[in-house]
């Protein structure tokens, strides 16, 4: 499962490629067809991450993606390849250099359009993300210090510290 640092990099890369531009959103597989129709043609404001969650803001609506164990993005410039397999979602836009840019999402655990209160409910159940600016580690410290659980298990608990996984636990 991709860990927090990977999601932060994805958020940065997607923001650089797509933010401030209308995005053509499709769901070749069909599982995200309603969400794709809602977002298609809208301008992407920004992409952020919190822990292992990715949030793409399109005005009042937010696309939430959690890659889970099997999810992945591929990206490129120019004309995207023909859709194949279980392609959940594709973004296409004119990139900052005038060339076409695209990204494909496959195998994600979550790919859904949420309102601000729904995003808040996700964030409320997570601990601090140490890679975010102004992250407050006192919450994690309090949860760790007050627990009798082994530190390795606590580090894997996303309500204690968001974004940490087996790579950092090891």
Where would I find each of the regions flagged by the language model?
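Structured catalytic/nucleic-acid-binding cores of DNA maintenance enzymes
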Residues: 1-170
């Amino acid at each position: 499962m991709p860990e927090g640092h990977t999601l932060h990099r994805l958020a940065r890369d997607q923001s650089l490629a797509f933010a401030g531009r209308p995005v053509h959103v499709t769901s070749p597989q069909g599982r995200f067809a309603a969400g794709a129709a809602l977002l298609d043609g809208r301008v992407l404001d920004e992409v952020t991450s919190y822990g292992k969650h990715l949030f793409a803001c399109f005005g009042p609506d937010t696309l939430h993606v959690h890659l889970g164990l099997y999810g992945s993005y591929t990206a490129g410039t120019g004309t995207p390849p023909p859709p194949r397999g279980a392609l959940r979602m594709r973004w296409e836009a004119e990139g900052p250099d005038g060339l076409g840019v695209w990204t494909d999402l496959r195998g994600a655990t979550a790919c859904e359009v949420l309102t601000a209160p729904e995003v808040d409910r996700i964030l409320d159940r997570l601990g601090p993300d140490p890679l975010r600016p102004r992250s407050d580690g006192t919450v994690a410290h309090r949860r760790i210090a007050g627990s009798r659980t082994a530190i390795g298990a606590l580090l894997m608990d996303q309500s204690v510290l968001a974004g940490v996984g087996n790579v950092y636990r090891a």
